[in-house]
Each structure stands twice: as structure tokens, then as C-alpha cells.
Curated annotation (Swiss-Prot):
Residues 131-301 are annotated as: ATPase activity. It holds the Pfam family Terminase_6C. The active site is at E256. This is Terminase, large subunit. Keywords: ATP-binding, Endonuclease, Hydrolase, Magnesium, Metal-binding, Nuclease, Nucleotide-binding, Viral genome packaging, Viral release from host cell. A motif (Walker A motif) lies at residues 161-167.
Length: 610
């Protein structure tokens, strides 16, 4: 009999704001069949035994026999006793150019494995178990789906939660690819060389445990690379652009893509390698890591814009997690609660539900970053993106952060429309190729175009000369000065802290609308660093810092003059709703003065300030 839900004891942290993301196990459908009590999972609609012991009995481990003396049983035969046929004396590895006495059954089985990767995996792929020795791989449902997609599609991107066993399924696919294809080079890329080497080790194990009739001969069997006698090879590399340049790969596998720094540079090197062949493959797998480059790759794949086939799997794909500590099926209720309590809800969503949360400590909240949309426009020859053309009756303010090193950091100029209550980014100059000698002339061109708008310049090493040239040489009177000697603003800890805090409020409260794609991308990797804010390793923050200058300026009294406002208090503009709520909560006390005495009449929920 089903038990009623106790709202005090049966709360789950995933169920927030009235949304039921996980049902209590007492609400699941049940049935009795074949002497087993079955419970229907809410995740895949399949029936599972109530007891974990029954689940293990139905999915029992299958050991692979050690067959080295019965070649007629070719499905498991390895000629281990013949050292002349072994590579470097290793019993599980066949030496190159060893002749195989093929039978019709062997040929048919070989073709079946070539054409059906799932059959190949479930029939011949094995792992070494710490207790049972060599056992057959038991594929999970998601692993079967992944194998089918990777095999049939040219470009695949997989958004997966942690600890699903993705390395195992990728290793099986790589082993299948090099065993059944001639002259194919495979490159494994990861954040670190040790991570790509781990994937290669798992692939080597999959090849090593194949029976002799499926295993190609070994030419090289090194720590960082292998080569087979069919001409195929696999190499493990760190994800630097130099790793793939000069090589021609038939397939590239990128592991933990979301955690690779400077991925843009690596991606520019990878694309020509893949595009060199019409059938070249690329496979990307990762757990999300905030809203960085992988978020863009995944979004483009889901929207069908990039040619990548998207696939995702989350924590409930591991069926052992659907049983509690008492080995009773609860559909993952206890496991998910314990995991969340051991970390945080946001971390659980990112690492176990493959959700794109903001990178830990980003200036702008992850929820806001996820809904920020950009407008795609083609920049002009100088790198200026125009989102809205200038209008004569509107008021604009510009901020400029000059690059300190040509070819490295970027010049970043933002032009903001401050006419209405909601401010809007209407133009962006973003370039790291413009010389600071000619930058004042280029900047002035756009400032004049936007109604000769005022500009606030950060006085860094090159900003001083740019501001001086703009104000004195070009006689542009719209340069906003902090003093008689400072033709702009000098960035300090205080100005940066106030500017960052103000910018966060402006964007999260929809006071400032951003249209520039690169600006939004920089926000995704602009996070807390000690007691300040900065771009994460391998990323830029020039566009964000130019907006931080605008955030600081908007808090200054002179902003009213440049924005052509009669009177403005930024807190009233940004937090109007919060201030109104405070006003309602703390209504004033009303004093009534009569002829004989004075008395007060408190308004309900009022508060006396006396």
C-alpha cells in the first residue's frame, strides 16, 4: 500500500519553487511479476527490481575464459603460448604481419563486428575486474546510444555528467575505429597530456583483450602512441595548437573540452585538420564548466547551426545510483540528496545534470548569463560593430580601454545610448591590431558619428597618450576629465571595485542591455580572483573592463551632465522595485495633533523613527 508523503521528511532540494523535478519513490508505479516486485522509474519509464540483489542477478557478470589452446573457439582464442607470434613477448598482443587462418565463420563474425559497433562492444570488449578478472563489458543504455551516434555521425558533441563511464565507451569506439579501418590516424586531445594518456591507456586495454582474429598486429605500443599493422595509429596530446599542426588526422577526440584554456587557439588549429577530409570525424565530450566556449559549441549544436550531433546523459544513467543504502530501489532519491548535501545544489546541477551554471564566482550570475542574447553583425575594417545607427536626438556616452601590447590585448571602445531609462550598447570597437598612434583618429571618427559623444578613457600606459592626442592634437572637447591634469580615469582598487559592483547591478537588473557577442563571452569567464575580479586563465577581459569604466562613471555626479539628466540617483534607477517594497514595508507613523493633547496613531505594520 502506498504511503502518504510527509512534506517535512520528504523534501528534496531539486524540487524548488513548486517545480517537481524528482518524484518521491512512494509515488512510483509497482507490480509483481515472476516472483519479483518491480518499480517503474520516472527517468526512462523502465521497470526495475525493488531489491538490488535481484538487479545484480539479472545483470550478472560474465567472465571471459582463458583460451590459448583451442583455436576452433576463435571467439576467445589468443595464441599466448606461441611467443614468436607475440609482440615484445606480451601474451595479449599479436605481433605485426602474423598470418591468420581465416574460416568462413571468422570472416562473417569479423564483418558483423565491423558493421555493428554495439554487437562488437557487448560480445568482444572486456575489462579487467579487481575481483573477477577479465569480464565482458556491460553497456549502459546511454553508452549504446553514444556508440551508435559516434559511429554514424561525422561530428559529435556530448554533454555528460561526471562519473558515467564515458572514458570506457570512448575507448571502445576508438578501438573499433582503428581495428576496422586502414591507414587512419587518431588524435586524442585533453587539457593535460596525462588526461589524454589515460584515454589512450583505456583504448589500449580494449585492443589488448580482443581475441586474435579481431586484434590487428602491433607495430608500436608506446606510452603516448600506438601503431597497428593495418596502418592505423593513435596519439595522445595536450591540447595546444602545436599538437595538431603538421598532422593529418582522420579523427580527433577532445576530452573535457570545457576545461581547456585558450581553446579558441586550439580550435583554429583543429578545424583545418578535420576539414582536410570529407569523412574526418571529431568527437567532443565534457562536463559543463560554466558558460564558456563549450556552452557556445553545445548551443550551436542543439540549434542545428554547427553540424555537430548533440547528445547528453545525466546522473540517473548509472542505474546503481537508483538504489539506496539499504539496496532498495528509490529512483535515485537518496543518492541525489546525499550528493547535494556533500557539495551544493549549483554544483550538483552542473556536474550531475549537465546544466550550464555560471562559472564559480563569475561577476554576472549564471542565470543571467544564460539568457543574455547577442546580435550578430559584421564588423567594419577597423573592427567596429554597429548595432544601432546614430540618431540626432539621442544621447551617447563612450568608454575606452586601450590595449597595452599590440597583437596581445585588445582596444575596447563601448558606445552606450543613455537617452532612455534602459541604457543600450549601440557600438563596439574591438581590435588588437590598431596602432595606438592612429587609434585616436579612428576613435574620434566613431565619436563624431555618434553626435560627438563624450568619452571616458582609462589612463593606462597607452591610454595617456591616446587621451592626450585626442584632446590636444585633434582638439576633441568631449574627453571626460577627472581633474585639470587627468584626461580620463586612473584605475585603482576602489574604482575597480565600485565599477564592477555597479556593472553587475546594471546588467542583472536589465538597466544596461548588451548586444556584442564577444562582450557576453568575456562576462562568462570574468570571475572572482582573490579580492578582485579578472579574466580566467587564457581569456581576455578588455571589453568587460571598458564597461567597468562606464559603471564607475555612472556613479559620479558629473554623469548627470554628460547624460543630460536633470537629476538622477542610480540606486533609484536600478533598484526602483526594491525601494518601493521597502517604502511599503516601513510606512511612516502618523501623528494627530488635537486641541487638548498630542497623540499618535500608528499605521498597521508601521515603524516609528523617533
Amino acid at each position: 500500500m502506498e504511503q502518504p508523503i510527509n512534506v517535512l521528511n520528504d523534501f528534496h532540494p531539486l524540487n524548488e519553487a513548486g517545480k517537481i523535478l524528482i518524484k518521491h519513490p512512494s509515488l512510483a508505479e509497482r507490480k509483481d511479476e515472476d516472483g519479483i516486485h518491480w518499480i517503474k522509474s520516472q527517468w526512462d519509464g523502465k521497470w526495475y527490481p525493488e531489491k538490488f540483489s535481484d538487479y545484480l542477478r539479472l545483470h550478472k557478470i560474465v567472465k571471459i575464459p582463458n583460451n590459448s589452446d583451442k583455436p576452433e573457439l576463435f571467439q576467445t582464442y589468443k595464441d599466448k603460448n606461441n611467443k614468436r607470434s607475440r609482440y615484445m613477448g606480451l601474451p595479449n598482443l599479436k605481433r605485426a604481419n602474423i598470418k591468420t587462418q581465416w574460416t568462413r565463420e571468422m570472416v562473417e563474425e569479423w564483418k558483423k563486428c565491423r558493421d555493428d559497433i554495439v554487437y562488437f562492444a557487448e560480445t568482444y570488449c572486456a575489462i579487467t575486474h579487481i575481483d573477477y578478472g577479465v569480464i565482458k563489458v556491460q553497456l549502459r543504455d546511454y553508452q549504446r546510444d553514444m556508440l551508435k551516434i559516434m559511429s554514424s555521425k561525422r561530428m559529435t558533441v556530448c554533454n555528460l555528467s561526471r562519473q558515467l563511464g564515458k572514458t570506457t565507451v570512448v575507448a571502445i569506439f576508438l578501438a573499433h575505429f582503428v581495428c576496422f579501418n586502414k591507414d587512419k590516424a587518431v588524435g586524442i586531445l585533453a587539457h593535460k597530456g596525462s588526461m589524454s594518456a589515460e584515454v589512450l591507456d583505456r583504448t589500449k586495454q580494449a585492443i589488448e583483450l580482443l581475441p586474435d582474429f579481431l586484434q590487428p598486429g602491433i607495430v608500436e605500443w608506446n606510452k603516448g602512441s600506438i601503431e597497428l599493422d593495418n596502418g592505423s595509429s593513435i596519439g595522445a596530446y595536450a591540447s595546444s595548437p602545436d599538437a595538431v599542426r603538421g598532422n593529418s588526422f582522420a579523427m580527433i577526440y577532445i576530452d573535457e573540452c570545457a576545461f581547456i584554456p585558450n581553446f579558441h587557439d586550439s580550435w583554429l588549429a583543429i578545424q583545418p585538420v578535420i576539414s582536410s577530409g570529407r569523412r574526418s570525424k571529431i568527437i567532443i565530450t565534457t562536463t559543463p564548466n560554466g558558460l564558456n566556449h563549450f556552452y557556445d559549441i553545445w548551443t550551436a549544436a542543439v540549434e542545428g547551426k554547427s553540424g555537430f550531433e548533440p547528445y547528453t546523459a545525466i546522473w540517473n544513467s548509472v542505474k546503481e545510483r537508483l538504489y539506496n543504502d539499504e539496496d532498495i530501489f528509490d529512483d535515485g532519491w537518496q543518492w541525489s540528496i546525499q550528493t547535494i548535501n556533500g557539495s551544493s545544489l549549483a554544483q550538483f546541477r552542473q556536474e550531475h545534470t549537465a546544466a550550464f551554471e555560471g562559472t564559480s564566482g563569475t561577476l554576472i550570475s549564471g542565470m543571467k548569463l544564460a539568457v543574455m542574447d547577442f546580435i550578430e553583425v559584421t564588423p567594419d575594417d577597423h573592427g567596429f560593430h554597429q548595432f544601432k545607427k546614430p540618431e540626432p536626438d539621442r544621447k551617447y556616452i563612450a568608454t575606452l580601454d586601450c590595449s597595452e601590447g599590440r597583437g596581445q590585448d585588445y582596444h575596447a571602445l563601448h558606445i552606450i545610448d543613455v537617452t532612455d531609462d534602459v541604457w543600450e550598447q549601440v557600438g563596439v570597437l574591438h581590435s588588437n591590431t590598431i596602432s595606438h598612434l592612429i587609434l585616436p583618429d579612428i576613435v574620434m571618427r566613431y565619436l563624431v558619428e555618434y553626435n560627438e559623444c563624450p568619452v571616458y578613457i582609462e589612463l593606462n600606459s597607452t591610454g595617456v597618450s591616446v587621451a592626450k592626442s585626442l584632446y590636444m592634437d585633434l582638439e576633441y572637447e568631449g574627453v571626460i576629465c577627472d581633474s585639470y591634469t587627468d584626461l580620463g580615469m586612473k584605475q585603482t582598487k576602489r574604482t575597480k571595485a565600485v565599477g564592477c559592483s555597479t556593472l553587475k547591478d546594471l546588467i542583472e537588473k536589465d538597466k544596461l542591455i548588451i548586444h556584442h557577442r564577444a562582450t557576453i563571452q568575456e562576462f562568462r569567464t570574468f570571475s572572482e580572483k582573490g579580492v578582485s575580479w579578472a579574466a580566467e586563465e587564457g581569456y581576455h577581459d578588455d571589453l568587460v573592463m571598458s564597461l567597468v569604466i562606464f559603471g564607475w562613471l555612472s556613479t559620479q555626479s558629473k554623469f548627470i551632465d554628460y547624460a543630460d539628466k536633470d537629476d538622477m540617483r542610480l540606486a533609484s534607477e536600478v533598484f526602483s522595485k526594491e525601494l518601493q517594497d521597502m517604502s511599503d514595508d516601513y510606512a511612516p507613523v502618523i501623528f494627530v495633533d488635537s486641541v487638548h493633547s498630542a497623540e499618535y496613531v500608528p499605521v498597521s505594520h508601521g515603524m516609528s523613527m523617533v
